[in-house]
Amino acid sequence: MLRWTVHLEGGPRRVNHAAVAVGHRVYSFGGYCSGEDYETLRQIDVHIFNAVSLRWTKLPPVRPAARGQAPVVPYMRYGHSTVLIDDTVFLWGGRNDTEGACNVLYAFDVNTHKWSTPRVSGTVPGARDGHSACVLGKTMYIFGGYEQLADCFSNDIHKLDTSTMTWTLICTKGNPARWRDFHSATMLGSHMYVFGGRADRFGPFHSNNEIYCNRIRVFDTRTEAWLDCPPTPVLPEGRRSHSAFGYNGELYIFGGYNARLNRHFHDLWKFNPVSFTWKKIEPKGKGPCPRRRQCCCIVGDKIVLFGGTSPSPEEGLGDEFDLIDHSDLHILDFSPSLKTLCKLAVIQYNLDQSCLPHDIRWELNAMTTNSNISRPIVSSHG
């Protein structure tokens, strides 16, 4: 029984950030926030959410190892990707309005909180943003995005073997997925499932004739081939900047935006790769408002979703030009315990807590007390 169980405000106000789950913690890297100074080049920020205490913390800036020597830290960016392999977060791609896009690989040690730039070889992908990254074993797969130098959408797949730090451009077989950015790619078994994103009627080049594909495309990492997929009778609307995650061998997507429909979404869909069918899911409880560019991480049987941007309530759900960046966080529980359901009842009906054990009162307080590290709200335009 899926249920939205937690809604807290006051976390990092972020759009187009990237995040990974490490145990019971979620690490969030960078992103954009309306009203912040992005002309001045600065270090990427790192926020950590503790899924037990339900509290956010922010890591302090990295100090130079020696006087006059700049620390090895990625610059602040958005549209980048992060993946976790062992105890290392690999951050790649993204862009900044001052420096443009980047193709330097950064490694972040979750134990020491230190950054490094591993020496890589092979065919390094061109600098881009809006790509996807997913992991199979010790290999990271990069697909799509918008390449800065070529000034076009990509449908290439690159892989990085992190045991040898070697990049490879995969010569794929079969009918490739269309060029796109801000899609999702989710690894289920040895297959990469690509959904959504923004494409263009004129192929790789951007002409403002946008296409929002709602067909699942599947890439087999063993044969390095795009598979021919059967038609699906029920489909979500095509969208970009949504969230996707795998749970119990199935694919889920949430939210996103379709410019042709001028619509933001807050629907949740489940895709079964065996029957190749979609099903719309209606969780219990109050979920997030329609949004795009949020982050979503799985922690055990829970989904932690935070940030993103939505139309201003005064403008309705479809206005592209007045957006509000979010500092909220929502938790979707796939298997809420009886204890969790009881705590929700105490909160919903404002029941007396004085007779409850101290640890239960502490948990109730954590579930209802907002964080306080977000910037003041600012509208964005465009």
Curated annotation (Swiss-Prot):
Gene Ontology molecular functions: chromatin binding; ubiquitin-like ligase-substrate adaptor activity
Pathway given in the UniProt record: Protein modification; protein ubiquitination
Superkingdom of this protein's organism: Eukaryota
Cytoplasm in keyword set: yes
Compartments, record wording: Cytoplasm
One GO location term (cellular component): Cul2-RING ubiquitin ligase complex
One Pfam family cited in the UniProt record for this chain: Kelch_6
GO terms of biological process kind: meiotic cell cycle; proteasome-mediated ubiquitin-dependent protein catabolic process; protein ubiquitination
Keywords in alphabetical order: Cytoplasm, Kelch repeat, Meiosis, Repeat, Ubl conjugation pathway
Kelch repeat copies, ranges: 25-77, 88-138, 139-189, 191-249, 251-301
InterPro entries per record: Kelch-typ_b-propeller, KLHDC3-like
Keyword DNA-binding belongs to the record: no
Role description: Substrate-recognition component of a Cul2-RING (CRL2) E3 ubiquitin-protein ligase complex of the DesCEND (destruction via C-end degrons) pathway, which recognizes a C-degron located at the extreme C terminus of target proteins, leading to their ubiquitination and degradation. The C-degron recognized by the DesCEND pathway is usually a motif of less than ten residues and can be present in full-length proteins, truncated proteins or proteolytically cleaved forms.
Assembly, per entry: Component of a CRL2(KLHDC3) complex, also named ECS(KLHDC3) complex, composed of CUL2, Elongin BC (ELOB and ELOC), RBX1 and substrate-specific adapter KLHDC3. May form oligomers as a KLHDC3-ELOB-ELOC complex; this interaction is likely autoinhibitory for the E3 ligase complex.
Name this protein carries in UniProt: Kelch domain-containing protein 3
Species: Bos taurus
